[in-house]
Amino acid sequence: MKKDELIFKLIEQENNRQCEGIELIASENFVSPQVLKAAGSILTNKYAEGYPRKRYYGGCQIVDEIEQTAIDRLKHLFHAEWVNVQPHSGAQANMTVFLACLQPGDYFLGLGLSHGGHLSHGSPVNFSGLSYKALEYGTEKENGKINYQQLEYVAMEKIPKLIIAGASAYSRDWDYQRIRLIADKIGAIFMVDMAHPAGLIAAQLLDNPLHYAHIVTSTTHKTLRGPRGGIILMGKDFENPWGRTTTKGKIKMMSEILDSALFPGVQGGPLEHIIAAKAIAFYEALQPEYVVYQKQVKKNAQVMAKALNSTGYKIVSGGTDNHLMLVDLRSKFPTLSGKQAEVALVSADITVNKNMVPFDNRSPFLTSGLRFGTPAITTRGAKEPLMEEIVELIDTVLSNVDNDKIVSSVKKKVNILMKDYPLFAW
């Protein structure tokens, strides 16, 4: 078979881009060589519809062991009674929960997209907003933190069947217990999407939502530092509250409903090569050095937020408890959009993403904010002093977005700087 020169050339170019630049996108990270090896392994050849020891295909005895290992490790990592490691993505994990818990047209409540929420928590262009009636809560205008009073008011007024906590651009920990109490008042299922802070939660640096939520979903990349994929977890399994029964009349456990909602409800065959890579990532997350890594992620984020703040940038919520921060550019550069800022920084090989901020007066295509995160740069071995240096480089670019010469000089500094940092340091 003739080698596909074009695609491998592009892969090499992407490798160079990742190595030469500063990666600050909060949802990105660099996986270990062994995770990468498993994700590209011969396991991609195997079809395995169903679950371990309950497959619709023969020859699954080895992938059964692999998937069961991933299940056991994930349970141990988050102290879960039940997990499912098959979701192809976080969005499909969320879709599974919706299918299991809601009927089309039912109300559910999630954090608004412009306040840091995720597409799959009720965006009108997403399955969640198209098939179900989305209600939203937001953050407080004064301090940028979750408006729990608004959340409770909407919940008590509309009685949603599902309440979602979790975000894609929120830098503080959550009061899961408070939301669970609200959910219990109205008989709602409480789901937490911990996709962003999952690694910090695994390292016990943030509150574990499995102690409070009925159901938890996550991605396996981001802070968890595994392959791209999703997971669903429960701290404790329970009888479904709707009285759904088996053909023999026994009330189904929630785990049974979630399993069947994922397969055959949302997906067909699982990606066993990715499940193997997930298993390795869970193994890595159970090692002592992983906790050290996550502590550094958090320290780096706090130093970066402090440096940005002292340079005149406004951090939404005033700081960070996790791995990310949302910067409102309007306080320092009123006429600079998030899109313009992103383009300028990417030109200097500093990769970030534009992001809406609470009460934004710009469209989602322009935005007034930038989101920064430290998981990827920390994986490369970066520590606190480099965070301060990076903020200086960011400020130089954003103060000179129309000056190609200055942006180019920053790019050269970035490329020289990153030569000392391997893609995966620990």
Swiss-Prot record:
What one GO molecular function would you report for this record? glycine hydroxymethyltransferase activity
Q: Can you tell me where the transmembrane regions are?
A: none
Gene Ontology biological process terms from the UniProt entry? glycine biosynthetic process from serine; tetrahydrofolate interconversion
- GO annotations of cellular component type: cytosol
Q: Which cysteines are joined by disulfide bonds?
A: none
Positions bound to (6S)-5,6,7,8-tetrahydrofolate: L113, G117, H118, L119, S363, P364, F365
Instruction: PTM N6-(pyridoxal phosphate)lysine: list the residues.
Output: K222
Q: In which pathway does it act?
A: One-carbon metabolism; tetrahydrofolate interconversion; Amino-acid biosynthesis; glycine biosynthesis; glycine from L-serine: step 1/1
> Where found?
Cytoplasm
Q: Where is this site: Plays an important role in substrate specificity?
A: H221
SUPFAM superfamilies linked to this entry: PLP-dependent transferases (SSF53383)
Give the family from UniProt: Belongs to the SHMT family.
Q: What does this protein do?
A: Catalyzes the reversible interconversion of serine and glycine with tetrahydrofolate (THF) serving as the one-carbon carrier. This reaction serves as the major source of one-carbon groups required for the biosynthesis of purines, thymidylate, methionine, and other important biomolecules. Also exhibits THF-independent aldolase activity toward beta-hydroxyamino acids, producing glycine and aldehydes, via a retro-aldol mechanism.
Q: How does it assemble?
A: Homodimer.
**Name of protein:** Serine hydroxymethyltransferase
Which gene does this sequence derive from? glyA
